[in-house]
Structures are given as structure tokens and as C-alpha cells.
A protein has these predicted regions:
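Active-site phosphate/pyrophosphate-binding segments
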Residues: 152-157, 163, 168-318
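Flexible glycine/proline-rich, aromatic-decorated loop/lid segments
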Residues: 53, 391-423
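Glycine-rich, charge-decorated loop segments at or immediately adjacent to ligand/cofactor-binding or catalytic sites
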Residues: 51-61, 385-393
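Long, well-ordered, tryptophan-enriched scaffold segments
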Residues: 55-56, 60-209, 213-214
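Acidic/polar loop patches that form or flank catalytic/metal-binding clefts of enzymes
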Residues: 86-90, 179-182, 195-197, 220, ...
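Beta-sheet entry/capping signal
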Residues: 14-16, 41-45, 59-61, 109-111, ...
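Long, C-terminal catalytic modules of enzymes
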Residues: 419-517
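Extended redox/cofactor-interaction regions of prokaryotic respiratory oxidoreductases
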Residues: 1-47, 71, 241-390, 399, ...
Length: 592
């Protein structure tokens, strides 16, 4: 949730904290960024059980007990709330902190309170009355109470001001003395509020209010696998984002900056699909973001619909799936047996399971009838990796020097905070052996199977190969894998008809395309009127075909910000799981 979608403001940050970052994580960009920070004397803090790599060059190091990062972070939040070192203006204007929470008993308890038009609202400081959250001139009141309903901020403060989050209560478990935790919180507060920076730049927010400057809290954070490789990793990442938000450091000068096309409204992402029928393609994308328990990948009897058990009560937020569970689950026949295992450059016994011997046994194990438990394995790779010996069918791939590749804004972006960008690779030499680029093989397979997206109305193949697909495929009208040089004349950016000369234009430009945003669009992307309107026009934010066809939740800057705004501690999508557990919302979990 850090390097893929954003990065610290290397130019302005004064205080940079690393959580669980090893030297091979996000290696080159963070090395360059750290070089900039050290070169101008910014303070670097490492939180990691061992002091190697990046932590070795940190100005201070906190040798935390593994898996307790979230507890430390929430203790820092406790200290900041206790000291009143919280960016109240940021929380009120740019987050859901001033929204009211339904506190009435019943199925809506704990969810965001809605008005008669089913829209969330706030109490306006000017009038003391309910007002639209995104209304022009509205001044949301964080401390308001309306008919017994309190704000998200009040619920959050009440929770984390509890004594169980005090440094003295967590010190032993974290392995960090209480005095050091309090000192760290004081440092964060000092830099954020006493060393704030202000950039003189006129900009207009989504409400239509104009500002003369951009206020920044020059504190930034970066976290990697060290926090996520624990059963509490999801909640630890949430806690760290909460800390950033409370300090007012998200999308402000010196803080954490999104890389376009992010931030995106939730509705711009697909939901996972899992309904299958013989002879028909899947009902939609197999990965995505669940909005509630009714979208979990469960069969009618409550059993997992996917072999990896992603998007279940056990693993509800599996945006990328659970690849490491594929072979163990297939071998166990849990939740079901499989016929064929198809892998691409996935040397799973060696680089994904952390249990090489056991996985090799699973791949060759037989049942009581002498048949392989995993009957067939198809494998594609450019190299003769160890996995080749276990495959029944091998599809030799090309190397990256022999094929076209596309690094797309539709996937993990290579953008920078100030610019949207994508790129290609193109063949510099022809293969001298009997191999085919795997992407082209997939395009061919799609056509042979008659999949709708790969064939014309007459059943003929729609694309010649992957290069043809890159240029001519459209995810939405005018939006394809590459954003540069679109349109029949090649002058459109982001949205435009396919351009037959697009790949050549990329090659002439060093294989890259880049669109720089103006200084007015640099910060507050989630609330910046000009950025949101331009991002919509370029197709960076918008709907997902087949998921929300009109998807015009972002057709105006106000609507875009309403959906892309920063969520604080309370999120309806998460609260719905508690409701389902309690028997509300039409879906109930089992005891697990």
C-alpha cells in the first residue's frame, strides 16, 4: 500500500520513518530517495527487529518485537491525541472524520449516518445544522453531536485514548521502553506542527473553495513486507495510514504523495467474480476489492468458491489472491480437487512456499489408485527452472529482449507523484529457437476458446498477437493498456481511439510516455478540483465496465472527491463484516 500507489515527498520531507523495510524492498527508488534525504540532513528513523541495510543508516533505530508494529503505531497515536497534536483542520476538510456515526440500536448501528437522500452529512460549524459533506463553504464540525450521534473522529479518539494504548501498557510487548515511545511521538509532533512548510500556490478544492497556499506536514512513512508478513499485517497497515492521516501528511507537502492514477474512488475498482458455468467464461474479473460480505467468494453452502480460499471469511481482503496457498490446497483437495495446475514463471516450490521439500512432495504425490493427486501441470517459462521437471506440458517463453511488454496505468503504475506515465518493452532481437511470447500465447488461447474479448462477431481472432492487443484493446471506450499517443492522429492522452502507430511513437520516445501535472495539481489530489477533473478527462479515474457501467461517481470534481476522500478509522465496508457476524446485512459468518 506504499510503494505501489505512492511515495514520500522526497523533496520536502524532514522526518522519514521506515517500518519493516529490508534492503531488497523497493530497492532502487528508495535508495535514491534516502540519498536525497541524507544529503540535505533530513532525519531517518528505522523500526525493524534487526539493524541492517536501510536501518543501519538511520539516525535512530527502534528494535521492535516482530509483529508488534501496529501496537507501537497505535501507542504513538494515543500520545498524539493525548497531547492535542492532531491536524484538526485536515481531518475536518479532507477526511471522513466529521461524518456522523449511527448510534441507534439496529442493523445500521456503527455505520455512517445517511440523510433522506442516502448521503452522508456533517454538522456545519457556521449554523450548527446538518449540511452536505461536500457543500461549498461548509465547515465540518469534528466535535458535533446530532440527535445522539457522534462523529467518526469522536469514536476514533475515544478508542485510542484508552489506557490499553498508553506507552506503559505496550512497552513490554513491543520491546521498546515507554520513554522512547513518548519521545518518538514528541518528535513526530514537533516536525509536523512546529516545522510545517507552506508552498505559495493558489488552488481550488472540490467544494469550490480557493486556497492561496498548500500547507504541509513534512513527516513521511514507508512500510513493506516486514509488517505485512504477519497475520495482523492488514490491521498494522491500516494503523499506519491512520497515523499519517491524523498528522495531516497524506497528499500534503512533505508527506505521502499518491502516484497517478491514484487515489481512485472505491467504485472505480472491480469486485471479484467467481460464478462459473460449463462452457462459459467467468462472470467477471477474478480479483478486485470487496465492498461487503455479500461479495465474498462463497458457494451457496458457504464453502470457498476459489481454490486459494481468497475472499472468504478467513481471508476477506485478498486483493491479489493467495497464490502461496494454491498448491497446498490443491493437494489437500480443500476446498476441492483440481484437474490442471497452470503456472507462468512461478517457481512456486522454491520462491513462494518457504517449504521446498514439502511442495516437491505435493507435486509428485499419488493417491491410493496410483494417480497423481495433482493430475496435470502446465508450465511456461523462458528458463529451465526447477519447476520444468515437474511439468507435463511446457510452453517455452521468450526473454524480455525478444517480446513486447507493457507497463500500464491500468495496473501498478510507474508514475511519479507529479506525473502520470507508462512504458513498453519491444523486441531488440528475434528468437533463434522455437519459442513464443507467453502474452501472445494467451491471446491465441483466448481466441481458440472463443472468449468474447478475443474474437470478432464472426468468431475470428480479434488480435494477431500481444503487440496488436496492446494497441487495439480497450478496457473502456477510448481507454487501453497505454495512455500515450492515443487517437487516430496520436495527439490524445489517456482517452482516445486506438492509434496504429502508437508503439512506434513509444519507441521513438525511448519507450516511455509521461504527462506532467501543473503545480496547482501537485498536492491534495483527493480533494484538488483541477487534478480530479483532469484525471477524469484522461481516464485515470472512472468506472469499470461490467461493474458500474455509468460509473460517473467521478464525473465532477465534487463527486470524485466524495468517493476518493480519505477514510479515517471507520469504514462502512469493514463495519458490514461485524454486522454480518451479528446476523445483520443478510449474510452471516460461521463461528470461524
Amino acid at each position: 500500500s506504499f510503494w505501489e500507489f505512492g511515495e514520500p515527498d522526497w523533496k520536502h520531507t524532514k522526518y522519514f520513518m521506515l517500518f519493516g523495510v529490508a534492503e531488497d524492498h523497493d530497492s532502487n527508488p528508495i535508495k535514491m530517495g534516502l540519498g536525497k534525504l541524507k544529503g540535505r540532513g533530513a532525519r531517518v528513523i528505522g523500526v525493524n527487529p534487526i539493524r541492517t541495510g536501510y536501518n543501519a543508516i538511520a539516525d535512530d533505530w527502534y528494535g521492535i518485537t516482530p509483529g508488534t508494529d501496529g501496537l507501537l503505531i497505535l501507542s504513538l497515536l494515543h500520545c498524539l491525541l493525548q497531547a492535542g497534536k492532531v491536524d484538526l483542520e485536515y481531518l475536518a476538510r479532507w477526511t471522513n472524520a466529521p461524518l456522523l456515526v449511527n448510534e441507534a440500536d439496529g442493523p445500521e448501528k456503527g455505520l455512517i449516518l445517511k440523510n433522506a437522500e442516502s448521503q452522508p452529512f456533517v454538522i456545519d460549524k457556521r449554523t450548527g445544522a446538518p449540511a452536505p459533506w461536500d457543500g461549498k463553504g461548509v465547515q465540518p464540525d469534528l466535535g458535533a453531536t446530532w440527535q445522539g450521534h457522534r462523529t467518526v473522529f469522536q469514536h476514533m479518539a475515544e478508542r485510542y485514548l484508552g489506557p490499553e494504548y498508553a506507552p506503559e501498557a505496550v512497552a513490554e510487548r513491543c520491546g521498546i521502553p515507554a520513554a522512547r515511545i513518548r519521545a518518538l511521538a514528541a518528535e513526530l509532533a514537533d516536525v509536523a506542527f512546529n516545522q510545517a512548510i507552506e508552498i505559495k500556490q493558489v488552488w481550488t478544492d472540490f467544494r469550490g473553495d480557493t486556497h492561496d497556499t498548500m500547507l504541509g506536514r513534512p513527516v513521511s512513512f514507508h512500510a513493506m513486507r516486514g509488517i505485512s508478513a504477519h497475520s495482523n499485517g492488514f490491521q498494522t497497515a491500516r494503523a499506519l495510514h491512520l497515523l499519517q492521516i491524523v498528522l495531516g501528511t497524506v497528499e500534503t507537502p512533505g508527506g505521502y504523495r499518491f502516484k497517478p492514477p491514484y487515489p481512485k474512488p472505491v467504485e472505480a475498482h472491480p469486485t471479484p467474480h467467481f460464478v462459473t458455468a460449463p462452457g462459459k467464461p467467468l462472470s467477471g474479473p477474478h480479483l478486485g476489492y470487496v465492498r461487503g460480505p455479500e461479495q465474498l467468494a462463497l458457494k451457496d453452502d458457504g464453502s470457498p468458491a476459489r481454490i486459494d480460499k481468497a475472499f472468504t471469511w478467513e481471508n476477506p481482503f485478498s486483493a491479489h489472491g493467495l497464490m502461496h496457498m494454491l498448491i497446498p490446497n490443491a493437494h489437500a483437495g480443500d476446498p476441492y480437487r483440481i484437474d490442471t495446475l497452470f503456472l507462468y514463471m512461478a517457481n512456486m516450490a522454491w520462491n513462494s512456499s518457504m517449504n521446498t521439500t514439502k511442495v516437491m512432495e505435493m507435486l509428485t504425490d499419488k493417491d491410493a489408485d496410483g494417480e497423481y493427486i495433482i493430475p496435470r501441470i502446465i508450465y511456461s517459462d523462458a528458463y529451465a527452472s526447477e519447476m520444468v521437471a515437474y511439468a507435463d506440458l511446457i510452453l517455452p517463453d521468450t526473454t524480455y529482449l525478444e517480446r513486447h511488454d507493457c507497463i500500464s496505468l491500468l495496473d501498478r503504475p510507474i508514475s511519479e507523484p507529479d506525473a502520470a506515465g507508462d512504458s513498453i518493452r519491444w523486441p531488440v532481437t528475434e528468437p533463434d529457437r522455437d519459442v513464443r511470447g507467453f502474452q501472445s500465447v494467451l491471446v491465441d488461447l483466448g481466441a481458440r476458446l472463443g472468449l468474447k474479448g478475443f474474437v470478432n462477431d464472426d468468431g475470428s481472432a480479434k488480435y494477431k498477437d500481444y503487440a496488436d492487443y496492446i494497441v487495439n484493446h480497450e478496457r473502456m471506450p477510448g481507454v487501453g493498456p497505454l495512455a500515450g499517443w492515443r487517437g487516430e492522429d496520436g495527439n490524445a492522452k489517456g482517452v482516445g481511439k486506438p492509434n496504429p502507430d502508437q508503439l512506434q511513437r513509444y519507441i521513438e520516445n525511448g519507450c516511455f510516455w509521461r504527462h506532467d501535472f501543473s503545480a496547482e495539481e501537485s498536492y491534495f489530489k483527493h480533494s484538488n478540483k483541477l487534478y480530479l477533473e483532469n484525471a477524469k478527462a484522461m481516464g485515470l479515474i472512472g468506472g469499470v465496465p461490467g461493474v458500474s457501467e455509468d460509473a460517473s461517481a467521478c464525473c465532477t470534481s465534487r463527486a470524485a472527491a466524495r468517493d476518493a476522500r480519505v477514510c479515517l478509522a471507520l469504514c462502512d465496508a469493514l463495519c458490514m463484516y461485524w454486522h454480518a457476524y451479528d446476523g445483520h446485512a443478510g449474510t452471516s459468518s460461521d463461528e470461524s
